[in-house]
Amino acid sequence: MSGAPVSGRYSGLRQRVLTALVLIAALAVVLFALPPAATLALVVVAILVGGWEWSAFVAPTRPALRAAFVALLALGIAAAWPLSGSRSGMLALLVVAGLWWLLAVFWILRGPQRVGAVLAAVAGIASLVPVAVALGRLRLEPGQGAWVLLFALLVIMAADVGAYFAGHRFGRIKLAPSVSPGKTWEGVIGGLLFSLIIAIVGARLLGWPVAVVAPLAVGAAAFSVVGDLMESLMKRHSGLKDSGHLFPGHGGILDRFDSLTAGIPLLTLGLLQAGLVGEGWPP
């Protein structure tokens, strides 16, 4: 056994857990105590903060260009939002997002090769605009928007939690060592299993068919790993360890919620295609 004190071995984990509990409490307040419009505003603010963090991948030493990227991101969200008011428009947006994440898989497989500012900016817009719109539309689901959004968040975040603990306990085979050395296939499998459990429980509570929701959730959770790896890849391109320092033990907005950038749009696409969401969304 190691002679290191228990407090030393688990201090990092304790900090992560405490931060996560605070975030969960804040999420509950945002979803169930605030009106939908306030939730939408906070979603946009959070995405723009994430955009500021992403801008460090674009032009780390040029504040004016970083601010320009955030402004471009805001314009992208503003342009995409009215498009998402119709089923066909939302489907088009989410399909484009899905194609982007498929392309991202091949980019990640190439490993941490440097990219220019323009490509980094395009990747940021493609990653952040769809998740902002999808989160907003899920919250506006008539009757149970807060619960639907909570379900989607928990499914994707469960993949993170399951991967963290399964990877630490059983991790042996590296997933993408040149991009994120700490991630393992065992962790991914553990994350998918935890997402599946959350999806089954959530589907039953929402009155949705488990046979439809479970595979959608697992597929979205699998792609959430791509969102995580994409942020890791961009950090390696930029020589950064964390995207920010907003959350103790978790880094910045992107470090905490990078998996949502891929997982939420693809889960929303599946739920929309299955007819489980999207009826009665306001324009």
Regions found by a protein language model. Give the residues of each.
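Interfacial loop-to-transmembrane junctions
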Residues: H237-L260
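Membrane-embedded alpha-helical bundles of polytopic integral membrane proteins
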Residues: S2-G219
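Final/C-terminal transmembrane alpha-helix of multipass membrane proteins
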Residues: R256-L272
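Short helical (or helix-break) motifs at transmembrane helix termini and adjacent helical loops
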Residues: A158-H168, S224-R236
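Juxtamembrane boundary at the C-terminal end of a transmembrane helix
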Residues: L269-P283
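Hydrophobic side chains within alpha-helical segments
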Residues: T19, A56, A163, E231-M234, ...
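Re-entrant/interfacial helical elements at transmembrane boundaries that shape
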Residues: H168-R169, K235-H237, T261, P265-L266
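Hydrophobic transmembrane alpha-helical segments of multi-pass transport and channel proteins
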Residues: A221-L229, I253-T261
